[in-house]
Every structure is written in structure tokens, then in C-alpha cells.
Amino acid sequence: MEPEVEVYALGQHICMSAHKARRVIDQIRGRPYDEILMILELMPYRACYPIFKLVYSAAANATNNKGFNKTALIISQAEVNEGTVVKKLKPRARGRSYPIKRPTCHITIVLQDISKDKNFYIWLRKKGGWIYKEKYIDIREKYEYFLHEALNRGRMEWANSGYEVVWDKK
């Protein structure tokens, strides 16, 4: 029996159009947790903040409830469904009123721990297109390798080789 490798967070009745939320969700689907937080922090859309809170909540569920490492989390599923429409009446001239429709949406974020999943394979994007990679490379390892290469080209020493880099914003 395989261990559970997924954890989720669900946001219901978020006051925004499902179309606007999907625009942001499509940008973060399949990416690692660290990269998602940076992308959502820098995107200029109003939908980013509720999605940021959901991703952060799902990661907190993963670490507290399941004991997963945040550096090995990716978004395996992210979906946006239409919710109910909140209807209000706006008073107008001569005793009339116009209806106002406020759409809502339901957002589901599912995070997967890659280090615990034996059957996980990752697709990497290269200049020529997508290539299939059978072995998962930890994001932290890629980051450390990049820093090591950049600093060695400049003939500098890098002392913090064992430091774990996780960007966490509350």
C-alpha cells in the first residue's frame, strides 16, 4: 500500500469570476511550491491573493498534518468551478432598481509530495520543447547548483552549502 502523497485546500464562495481566477491558476499548475509563491506575489491580478492564501494553507496542511517537506511539494491539481451568483438590487432614480450580479467561484488546490511518490515523473521544458525526465531533481539542489556555478565563475567561496532555502510569507 502506497503512502498518501496528496493534500488539498478548498476555498468556496470567493467573490470573483471563475474566468479571472482560471487565468491565474493556469500559470501555476504543475509548478513547485517555492516558485508558486514568488509568481503569485509578483502577478498584478486581484485573483492572486485568495489563491496565494489557499496554496499557503495547503502547504501548512501538508507540513502539520502529514509531515511533508515544503521543498518537495508541487501542485498536482488546481481547478476553479463556478459558484452561486449573489444577487443584489441597486436603487435608481424614480423608485426603480437595477439588479447587480456578483459571481463567486470555488477553488481547489491539491499539492503532491514528490519525494514520497515512487511513480512520479517530471516533464521539463527546454528550448526545443518538452522533454521527459525520469528522475526528480530537487528544487533546492538546482538552486544550490546554480549559486555554486555562479559564484565559482566569479572566483568566490560559497559557505552555506547545506542551507535550506524555502521562501515562506505569512
Curated annotation (Swiss-Prot):
The organism's superkingdom is given as Eukaryota
Please provide, in alphabetical order, the Gene Ontology terms of the cellular component aspect for this entry: chloroplast; large ribosomal subunit
**Which controlled-vocabulary keywords does the entry list?**
Chloroplast, Plastid, Ribonucleoprotein, Ribosomal protein, RNA-binding, rRNA-binding
Give one Pfam family.
Ribosomal_L22
Annotated PROSITE patterns: RIBOSOMAL_L22
Q: Name one GO biological process term.
A: translation
Its subcellular locations are:
Plastid, Chloroplast
Q: Does the keyword Protease apply?
A: no
Q: Which GO terms describe its molecular function?
A: rRNA binding; structural constituent of ribosome
- InterPro entries noted in UniProt: Ribosomal_uL22, Ribosomal_uL22_bac/chlpt-type, Ribosomal_uL22_bac/org-type, Ribosomal_uL22_CS, Ribosomal_uL22_sf
Described function: This protein binds specifically to 23S rRNA. The globular domain of the protein is located near the polypeptide exit tunnel on the outside of the subunit, while an extended beta-hairpin is found that lines the wall of the exit tunnel in the center of the 70S ribosome.
Subunit details: Part of the 50S ribosomal subunit.
Q: Which HAMAP family match?
A: Ribosomal_uL22_B
Checking PANTHER family in the record gives: CHLOROPLAST 50S RIBOSOMAL PROTEIN L22-RELATED, LARGE RIBOSOMAL SUBUNIT PROTEIN UL22M
Q: Which family does it belong to?
A: Belongs to the universal ribosomal protein uL22 family.
Q: What is the recorded name of this protein?
A: Large ribosomal subunit protein uL22c
Tell me the organism.
Answer: Nandina domestica
Source taxonomy: Eukaryota, Viridiplantae, Streptophyta, Embryophyta, Tracheophyta
Q: Which gene encodes it?
A: rpl22
